[in-house]
Every structure is written in C-alpha cells, then in structure tokens.
Amino acid sequence: MEVPEPTCPAPPARDQPAPTPGPPGAPGGQASPHLTLGPVLLPPEQGLAPPTVFLKALPIPLYHTVPPGGLQPRAPLVTGSLDGGNVPFILSPVLQPEGPGPTQVGKPAAPTLTVNIVGTLPVLSPGLGPTLGSPGKVRNAGKYLCPHCGRDCLKPSVLEKHIRSHTGERPFPCATCGIAFKTQSNLYKHRRTQTHLNNSRLSSESEGAGGGLLEEGDKAGEPPRPEGRGESRCQGMHEGASERPLSPGAHVPLLAKNLDVRTEAAPCPGSAFADREAPWDSAPMASPGLPAASTQPWRKLPEQKSPTAGKPCALQRQQATAAEKPWDAKAPEGRLRKCESTDSGYLSRSDSAEQPHAPCSPLHSLSEHSAESEGEGGPGPGPGVAGAEPGAREAGLELEKKRLEERIAQLISHNQAVVDDAQLDNVRPRKTGLSKQGSIDLPTPYTYKDSFHFDIRALEPGRRRAPGPVRSTWTPPDKSRPLFFHSVPTQLSTTVECVPVTRSNSLPFVEGSRTWLEPREPRDPWSRTQKPLSPRPGPARLGCRSGLSSTDVPSGHPRALVRQAAVEDLPGTPIGDALVPAEDTDAKRTAAREAMAGKGRAGGRKCGQRRLKMFSQEKWQVYGDETFKRIYQKMKASPHGGKKAREVGMGSGAELGFPLQKEAAGSSGTVPTQDRRTPVHEDISAGATPEPWGNPPALEASLVTEPTKHGETVARRGDSDRPRVEEAVSSPALGGRDSPCSGSRSPLVSPNGRLELGWQMPPAPGPLKGGDVEAPRPVWPDPKLEGGARGVGDVQETCLWAQTVLRWPSRGSGEDKLPSERKKLKVEDLHSWKQPEPVSAETPGGPTQPASLSSQKQDADPGEVPGGSKESARQVGEPLESSGASLAAASVALKRVGPRDKATPLHPAAPAPAEHPSLATPPQAPRVLSALADNAFSPKYLLRLPQAETPLPLPIPWGPRHSQDSLCSSGWPEERASFVGSGLGTPLSPSPASGPSPGEADSILEDPSCSRPQDGRKGAQLGGDKGDRMATSRPAARELPISAPGAPREATSSPPTPTCEAHLVQDMEGDSHRIHRLCMGSTLARARLSGDVLNPWVPNWELGEPPGNAPEDPSSGPLVGPDPCSPLQPGSFLTALTRPQGVPPGWPELALSSHSGTSRSHSTRSPHSTQNPFPSLKAEPRLTWCCLSRSVPLPAEQKAKAASVYLAVHFPGSSLRDEGPNGPPGSNGGWTWTSPGEGGPAQMSKFSYPTVPGVMPQHQVSEPEWKKGLPWRAKMSRGNSKQRKLKINPKRYKGNFLQSCVQLRASRLRTPTWVRRRSRHPPALEGLKPCRTPGQTSSEIAGLNLQEEPSCATSESPPCCGKEEKKEGDCRQTLGTLSLGTSSRIVREMDKRTVKDISPSAGEHGDCTTHSTAATSGLSLQSDTCLAVVNDVPLPPGKGLDLGLLETQLLASQDSVSTDPKPYIFSDAQRPSSFGSKGTFPHHDIATSVAAVCISLPVRTDHIAQEIHSAESRDHSQTAGRTLTSSSPDSKVTEEGRAQTLLPGRPSSGQRISDSVPLESTEKTHLEIPASGPSSASSHHKEGRHKTFFPSRGQYGCGEMTVPCPSLGSDGRKRQVSGLITRKDSVVPSKPEQPIEIPEAPSKSLKKRSLEGMRKQTRVEFSDTSSDDEDRLVIEI
C-alpha cells in the first residue's frame, strides 16, 4: 500500500500540474470521449492519458496498448511510488511524475485523471500491473471466481462483495437513507455521498453555498486533507471508475460513487478554493491550467481539478464512464480481462466492471484502497497533493472517507439494485447512446444520464450537480457538454462567477438557478439564442431551459433542485421538487418521479424513471419532471427522433404529458396555462416564456422546441389564454399547430400571438371557432398529443416533423442544434419577426384564415378588428385557438373547423375576401414575415414564413379568395378552385374571385385536399358546401379532387379537412394562407408559412419577386404583395432553403400562391405560374418552385435548416399530412391554379384561368425559378445535375433535364420519406404525375402549370376547365410536384388510384379536370413535395430534397420526362396543354433553360402532357402526390419529385406512390398509369397517356409518357424510374407552339404513346445512372 500512499499524493500533485497541460488535458478529455485524442494524450502523458481515453473509448485495447508504452515509463516513476502496487495507485504513475510534473504537467494534465483511470486499468491490463504490485494480484486472478458469473476476483473479499451483486444481499443499510449496500465501503461512500449529500443539501440549501462547502468543509476543515483525501479517493475512485468501465454495470455506479465521493471532495476544494489553491500552489501550473482547462474540454479541467478536488476527477471519471458506457457492454469483457489479468488487486473493480455488482465490490475495494491510500497514501497526499496538513487531511480523509464510503456503498448498493438489473444495464447503454447522439445534452445527459443511474442518486445529485449547473448555466448550451465536465474547471477557471457557484455546492447555484430562472425568461431569448447554438433539441433545452436543467442536473441536488424549480418554477411541481431534494433526495425523487409519472412523462419514461430513481430524480425528475422531462419529451416529440427513449417518452409521455400538460394548461386556466406555458417556455424556451408576448416567440420556440410541449404549450397558449398565444398556437396550429412540431408555431404564435395579443383576446370569440375548432381540434390535439400517433395526419406530421425536425426541425433534429436551442433561437428570431409579423403572418394565414373564418363567421370581426381582417382573422383564428384552450385542438379546429367556418363565412367569403382585408393586412404580415422570414430562423422555423403573409397579399389580388387560397394550400386549392370556379372562365376573375374566394376558401379548405381543385372551381360556387365538406371530408378531398368539379368542392371540402386535417381546412377557412398555414402550418412552416405567407418556401424567396409578380397578375399581384412578405417568410424558409431565387419573381407569386397554399403548392399555382409562362407568370416562380422551394430549399439550408426548415417545410409537407389528404398539398394544387389565376389573366385566358393560369405562369416562372429555388430545396432538377433524383431511376436526364424531371420524380420518390407523415395522400399525387405534359418541353409552361399544379388538387378541376394551358402548367407542375409525400398514403391511395388509370378523356380532364388535376397535383405535390422535402429531411429516407430535385429535374426535364421516381412516373405523357398562349413560355424558356432544358424552352407552351398532367395532376395531385414532374420538366420533376418525395415520405412507402394512378379519372383521364400499386409502381412505368387534350384549347396533348418506373416500392427513396418515362408529351398547342420534342435516347426505353392526337411527342429519356449521383447528392443535402 506504499504505492497507494504516494499515489494518493502523487495524483493530486500531478493533477495540479495536469492543469498546465490543459491543452493536452483538453484533448485528453475529448480524446477520452472521442478516443481520437487518446493517442494525442498518450505522448504527452506518456501513454497514461491515452489509456484513460482508451479506457473511455476503447478501454481494453487502447488501454492495454497505451499502458505498456506509457505506463512502463511511468512504472519506473511509479515504481518508487507504487510500492503498495494498489490498483488505485496506478495513479501513482501519474502522481509519480509529480517531480517531472511541471514538465509532464504540460503533457499529463489530462493524464492525471487519465492516470487515475489508467492507473486502475493500466495496472490491470498493461505491464503496469506486473510492473507495480499488480503482478502478484494478477497472479491471484482466477483464484476467486464468481460461481455465478465466473468473474475473477483478486480477493475473497472482493468475491464476497461481488457475489452479493448476484444474490442481492445488502448487509450494509444506511439508516439515514434507508438504503442497504452490498459492501461497507459502499455504505461509507454512500454516507459520504448520499447521506452527506442530503445533509449537505439541506445545509447547502439552508446555508446557500456554505452548506455544501461546509459539509465538505468538515472534510474541508482540513482543506489539503479533504482534497488529498478527495484526490486519494478520487484516484481510487478513478481507478474504480477505470475498472468500472471494465464492467458496464458496475462501472457506472462506481463512477457515481467516485463522482459522489469526488464530488464531496470537490466541494471541499470547491468550498475551500484554498484546497484547490493549495494543490495548485503545489503545482503552480494548475492554476493557469485551470483557466486553460476551463477553455479546454471539461475533461482536462476535471483532471486538473482532480488533484485539486476529487470532484473534477469524479466528473472526469464520470465523463470517462459516460464515454465508456456506449461500449460498456462490450468493454466489460475486455475490461474484465484486463482487470483479471492486471487488476492491481482490484478485480473487485474488475468485479465492479462485471456488469451487475461490480460497482459494489470495486467501490468497496476502492474504498478500502482509498482507506489504505489514505492510510498509506494519506501522508503522500498531504505532501504530494498539497504537501500540507497531511495529518489533518488524513484524519479528515479518514472520516470523510468513511462517510464517503458509506455513502458510496449505499449509493452503489442502491445503484446496483438498479444497475445490477439487466434492464438497467441495457438501459444505460441505450441512454448513453442517446446521450452520445447528443440527444439532449451530450454533456449533461451524457454525463448525468450515465451518472444518473449511479451518480445522481447520492453524490452526484448534490455535488456534481453543483458544478454541472454552474457550468451549464454559465456555458452556452452548445458548450453544455464541456461545461458539465468543465463544471468545476470551467466555473473555476473560466467563470469566476461560476466558480463560486460551482464551489458552493448547491446554494449559490440554487440561488443562481433561481436567478437564472428569472433571467431565463428574459434569457429565454438568450437561451433560445443559445439554443440554436446547439442543434440538438436536448442540448438546446438543456442549454436554454436546461440551462438550468443541465446545470441543475450537474449541480448539487439542492442547486439542481432549485434550478429545476427555477426552470419548473412555472410548473410548480419541479420547484417543489427542487426544494424538496435538498431535504429528502429519495423522497424528492419519488415525488418528482410521481410528478413525472403524473405528467405523463412517467409513461414515456417508466424504465428510465426507475433508473432515475437511482440517480437523482431531482435531476431528472424534479428537473425532468417538469422541466427536464419536458425538455426531453419535447425533444422526443421534437425533431429528436434519435432518442428512442425520448421518443417513447414522447409517444407515451408526450401523449400523456401532452394531454396532461394540456390539462394542466386547461386546468390551470388561461392564466395558469399561460403561466404554464411560460413555464413550458421556461422549460422549452427558458427565457422566452417570461415575455408574455415576447414570450410567445419563446412560446413558439417552446412549442417548436418541444413538440410535446408544444401540444401542451399550445394548450397552454390556448388556455394560456393568450388568445394570441392560442392564436399563435392556433396559427401555429394552423400554421403553428404544425408549428408546435415544427416550431412554425413560434412565429405564428409570436406574430399572431404577439400581434394578436391585443385582439387575440377579442378573437377569443374564437370560441366560435372554438366550437368548430373543437371538433377538428380533436384531430390535431390527438395527433399532436400523440406526437407520432398520427391521430391526425396533420398533427402527426407535425409531431413527426417536430420530432424529426426538432427533429427538424430533427430537426432534428440540427435542430441540429438542439432543436430546443435552435428553436429557441428561432423563436427569438421569430420573436423578432413575429412581432411585426405576428398578426400579419400568422393571422393572415392561420388567424386570418380563422379570422377570415371568424371574420366570415363573425363577419364583423375583421372589420371589428381593423387590424384588420387580418387581425380579425387572426382574432378569429386566435379565438379559435384561444377558445381551443387545447390549442392543438384549437389549431386543428381552427384549421379544420376553420374551413367549415370559413366555408360558412367563406361563402360570406365574399366578406371573407373583404375580410381578406386580412389579405391586405397580410401584406403587412408579409412585411413582418419578411422581417420575420429574414429574422426567422431560416431553419425550422421558416415555417413561420408561410404565415399567410404572402397569402394575404395573394388574397389581395385575389381578394379574399387569394387570401383564402393563400390561406392554405388546402385553402388555396379551394381558393384556386374557387378561383377557378369563380374565375374559371375568367382566369383573373378568381383574383377578384372574392365570391369564389369565400366559396373557395371553403372550397379550398375543403378542397385543399385533392378534390379541392375541382371543388375549388366549383367550390367557389359550392363555397359553403365546400367549407363544410372540406372540413368533413378532407380525406375524400384527395379523391374528391378528381371528383366532379361541382361536387368536388363539397367532396373536396370533406377531404380537405382530412388532408389538411386542420390546416388545409383552416387554410381554406377564412384565410387560405392561414388555413394553409394551419395546413401547412400543420406542416408547420409549410402550412403556416405556406398558408400565411408565401413564406412557404418559395414564397419567401419571392419576396422581391412578388412585387413583380403582383403586377403581373391581378391575382398574382396580390400574391406578389404577399409574396414579398411571403418571400420574406418563405424567404425565411426558402431563403433558408435555398431561395431558388431565380425563381423569385415568379416565385413570389408562386411563393404567395404556394405560401398561400402550402407555399410550395401555393407557389406552384401562384400567380407566377400563370405569369411566368405568361406575362403574369413572369415574376412568379412556380408553385413548383414552391414545392421545390420546399424541396429545393432543403438542399440549400437543407440538413440543418432542412431539419428545421425542412421540417417546417415538411410540415407544409406536413402536409405530408397535408399531402396525406393531399388536401393541403392538393390544396396547394388548388392554389396552383389560384396563383396561376392570379398569375395571368392573360394566362388565365390562356389557361382559362383554370388553376393553371396562375399555375402555369407560375409554373413557368417557377420553372426557372424553380430551377433556381428548387435546387436549393429539392435540388430541383432545374438545371442542376444535382437533381436529387432521389428516387429517380432515371438518374440522369439523358437528354435534358427531362432526366431532371425524372430525377425530380425520383425526388418525389424520395418523398416517401414524407409519406409516412402523410401517407394517405400519395395516391392522389400519382395521377398528377402521370399527368405530366407530354411535351415536357412545354413543360416549361407545363412546369409552370405543373408547379401550379400542385394546387391542382384543389383547383385543377376548376382551372382545368377553361384553362387548358393553365391546367397544363398546373398539371405539369402538379406532376412535377406530384409528391409521393405521403408515400404510405400515397401508396395506399396509389393502390386505389393506381388502378384508376385516369381515363384519357381529354375532354373530361382535357379542360378543367386536367388542369384542375394539374393544379391540384402540382400544388399538392408541391405541398407534398415540400412536405416531402421536409419530411424527407426529417426522415432520412425521404430525402425531401428528392422531391425538390425531382421538381427541378422536372423543370429541366420538362414535361417530356415526367419521370416518376415513383412507379407512377408521369404517364401523363400528354397533357394537351391547351396553352395556346403557352407560346408565352418565356418562363418556360427559363424553366427549360434553367432546367438545363434539354427540352426546347418554347417547345410546348401548352403541354398536352401538362394538361393531361393537369387533369391527372389534379387527380394525382391529390392522389399521386401531385406529380408535377410530368407537367413540367421543372415543375413536373420538382413536383413529381416532391410528390414523390412527399409521397414516399416513407422511402419505401412513398415509392409506392408509384401508383401513378390518377385517383380520379376525372382529373386526369389520361393518366394511364399502370400503377402497380404503391409498391408495384416500382417497376411499372406509368404509361400515362394523358390524352388530356383540351379540346377547348384545340390542342390536345397526346403526350404519352411511358414511364417504366421501377418503383422501388419499398425503397421509396431510390425509386428510380426505371425507364424514365419517355415522355412523349405531345402537345399540340392551339398555337402550334412546337412543344419541343426532346429527343432523348430513352435510357429506359420510354414507351412513346401518342394519346389521341398527340401532335408532338416529346420523348424524354432519363438516364438513371448518370443522374443518380447528383440526385443522391441532392438527397444527401
């Protein structure tokens, strides 16, 4: 034991020097976790540090390797010191270098800790064992074998203790804690940790910083000694930890004990900095090292501190343990081997290494060794560490050690009880894995998760927590991990302020935590700011709300508790818990745990809680109960899908918690809810909460951050009364409901809530909505609550999105700053914008829609609230939301009911249009959005962008109608339909189509689904009916679209609701955007942004363009108006996304349209659709772009933003849900035409305004812009080879971007990822796809149309009618956007629709239908696509980009190749685009050009295929997911890609969408897609002969696209269109505008089929191979 003596002192000394090697230490610390630094440290530490690192990373191999080289040199050094050869004293080598310390110090700073850990293992495994006294002990290996597990114990005592782990015997009870331990040493440790912790905690809380310090003070009474002892113990502990790593089960507990003990020791030094200083004095470098350490990774700091204080070491060890944990299971054997071979007598440690009880024995041994060390090493530590007060220290250490050992023993026993469980063993690694994933806070979760199990229980709670919180608090969340480990060092060295807190075991930080609590509210913004720093939701939350939480957890229990209380101050329970823990950790834990369970988190985290029980539940439960749990749950709900436990928690916990929270919110009452929400914010946003209205942003962030919470937040908001909040929620619900998931809500809430604050209350009348909302609400709430329940596609998608995004957001996710952080930041940003945008963005889209609904319902409301209609709308929405205390429900209701309401008011929609002053306001919103968008976190929260701002403006041109269209994709389709209906004959009429608008609003709402397009048309007429139906049959909507135009409205209405779920419907509702926002909002950003502003994606981008657009189309103009805003908003999103700006001009409209609708859809059919191709269309990017914008943006901002934005987009794709119903997407489709309607009166004329007019122009505009925008988002095939052909078989457009199209299509395939979100919609898309214009060349126009087409679902039918061209454009767009978004659904529907080869009744779809289809399809697709993109991002498989890509390709590809990555390639080869005016394919040119148009730009002004596509699109838009691809190379590809992406939301599922079956023949008769069903689509090419020739146009495109699209049925993602469809888009433009026949060697023999009168066939051949990579790239992005 001589060695131990020197070892004890030596390590401190060494540790002291260690600080100097802070850099090495830092690397070491990092290396430890990463294992990369191991080698780095190795040289510096002479191999010691590396072993440590290795111990953590690869304890067995590396350790072994390192020790021999590194340790042997030490062996000589250690030899003298390590006479005792105690295992713990392998640290001796580290200590030994004390002399060389200064020199070595530079290197071994990390080694100190490393050495401690290494000391244990090295002695065990390397030559050190033999070199030191280990050999003898090693020789004993095998002597004492455990009869149960065969573990080799060096000593009988060890074996005895080890056996207890098997038998469960716990002969050493702790009277104080009532815990029995297997070993006396554990009991001692426990006393030192748990009992002392409790006492210390009590005293600490009572004394403040003094308590913990005093407790330690007892030990600190002999500062050097406690320190020495702490070090000695630490070293022993380190060894224990090292060995413990050997056994995963034991390792953690041992670590916990070590940590606890160390923590105790640390507090000693902490309380008495003198202690630290003394050692530091001994090793002057330590002081500098500390500062360095603070800078450096936590690991080094703890190492530095380890000499100074056991706590740092403990932290380090913990760290190591956490690091090791991941491979703990594997390591144990190796460790065991090591331990067995060279355990330096600590086979007990090896024992401890043994999974279950190893901790006890090792700890006991450790304790014994510590005692020995103290006895023998006590003097050493005195001189070695501080060289002073060895006797006093020794005495103090003895007592301390005894207590510590008791505590540790108890702790270990308790932990073992947990740890020994196989369950716990399994759990721990899982947790670690999650932590490692950076789920919550790598540092905190990572550390305390692992520690939780053991550390938190006793020592950790009090001590570690103290440092942890400080570190967390002071360090940004992103630094959270380092902070945690840094906690002491960072606090000590980096943050002096922190240091006292850190040192003060709990109270300082407790108070600090409270202080933080207060600051947190304000700080929430900061927190949010910080949060964004951390992509992960967990870290963000930990950082922000978890700023306290992480800090809390790490800090001493009191501190943690208090902090938790601070965080959970709002919730209250946590606070109580926080306070309680000081007194009774166990009781507190229990209470906290119970509270947790009550919260519903228990359900999600039952097992975890049990584990939590072991580790301080105060940390997890008190903090986690309200805060921590919430955070994690939110994370789970959020983008963070990575954390299964969390997800589970979210699933059950969230559902429980959500409802509970909702209940709490409800119970709390408005105010309480508000408070609660604030707490949530606190939890989520930390600082956001404080600001009531500022808070909303936080709130939003909160919502976003914690989808789970968002549900409750929403509820809170609703209850919170803050109508604004509610509205925010509602808005978000509409736009934010998704938002909750996405975080779109943030903006919505903030803007809505904020702006609406005042009138949110008035909107309280929203009860009106409330009632309505109530009905729908269930849908949202459920899904939302469910998180993954998918009770409502919308909600589900939202949740999913949130999870993903967040997780999205995951994130997401990404997120991934922690979604929390990111979201918070976003929220902050949003906050910025929200305030301006609030009403405008949110209200316009969501509130406005509701307002519009409300307004319409409460007609006076809009007027009442001048703020407008917008305000009114918002009010309404808000009231809706407000009334729906269950904001989620409200949101749903708003969305859903909204549509109904809207339906009613919509009819009054005329008033609604007036209301749509809201629209006017929306422009303001757009401005706000603009700011918002810019401000708004481009990422996840971009969703906010679509806050109907743009849509509002859009509505301006459209009048209410556009607003309505804007309202949501869903709404839009209706709107579009309405437009179409209204302006069917009069393309522009729709713009003024206030009348239709109302109807449309309803229609849109209803129509949003697929049907809406037709319905929209008729819906305008059916307005009221539609509203009703929309709300009712959203699902039907999807099919409806193809249904009769007249009925469709109603039918659509029904489907829209389902599709939009809430948002579409709501979009339709008063504010299309709003609803759409809801819809898209559902999709979160999408609906919200989409709905409200053009924000959805493209719209944002179009900020600038919209103005241009605005002029272009009356409708367009308005669109543009909003567009600018929209662009801003979308910009946020789009910008974030990629701002496919080339498309901006058209885009704005597109964006507007899209935004209005689903942004993507909206865009598609946005004005520019008509405009670009046509004058009006010129500025507008297409809806396609919108789609792409959603999809394409992904690439640009993609991953990170993709997660966030993407998710947001996805929400629009939530639309997945949207798409699912396709209502939203369809709605988008509707919008498509709407936009087009706006986009081109001329276009309308050209297109007859069927949705396509705007769409088409939009489409056209979109094409180029799409190309620009898409790429960033979906990697539109636009011209970029990156065409993200995610699923496209024809990887490359051989010829031109037909391949692009294909790729888009592939993208669409990729959509499947989204599909899962909104699976049900996929089929609808299908039709669209096939609808692809035969002459994709014309696809330009087709593309435009197609892009518009996304709206086709809603409006294709209507637009289709007269506006062949438009339809064509729409179709194309639709095709392009045809999104497999709801892959699953799509697949499902595909099956339905697959069968349904749309009859090639040119006449039938030839007109309206086709167009309608196209529009719907396009829009839907866009929606879907966007969604898909977003979804994709969230869903890796989805490759949301895919969609964009497809669309891009579509662009490039043009209609000719409407490759459907999905099996349903657009067979709509022909869309008799009756674009006589298609000649005005200026846009087309661009699109083509941009698309790298192989296809002649001018080629087909009218894409027959496009038209066909339109028809089909309409059909498919809904069904197939709006394959825009067909329609336009750009659009088509994009749309299709998007659709595909969307549809294939599930890679595999989505692919199924391959069904290329136009759900409704009506829409696209020509889609003769032999969809072999979702899956079968894989191989079957869609032979869609879209003989959609619009007789009216005189040109019927007989384009036949035989696309052998081998659907990768299951591989939705890579569904390559096997033979890209040869798109023989034969477009016989009325004007013989030669559709360029793109002669492409059909890589896959494309079946040319001329459908009736296919004048020109554009044969597009896609080369799968070539493009694949690019596609893939896109996908990757």
Curated annotation (Swiss-Prot):
Q: Which regions form coiled coils?
A: 391-423
- Which parts of this protein are zinc fingers (C2H2-type)? 144-166, 172-196
Write down the Pfam families for this protein, in alphabetical order: zf-C2H2
Quote the biased-composition stretches of kind Low complexity, using this chain's numbering. Answer: 880-894, 905-919, 1153-1170
Compositionally biased residues, Pro residues: 1-26
Q: Where is the composition biased (Gly residues)?
A: 376-385
Q: Where is the composition biased (Polar residues)?
A: 1518-1531
Cross-referenced InterPro entries: Znf_C2H2_sf, Znf_C2H2_type
Q: Does the keyword Repeat apply?
A: yes
Organismal lineage:
Eukaryota, Metazoa, Chordata, Craniata, Vertebrata
Q: Which organism is it from?
A: Homo sapiens (Human)
Q: Which GO terms describe its molecular function?
A: zinc ion binding
Protein known as: Zinc finger protein 831
| Biased composition, class Basic and acidic residues, residue ranges | 216-232, 325-341, 517-526, 674-684, 707-727, 813-834, 1649-1662
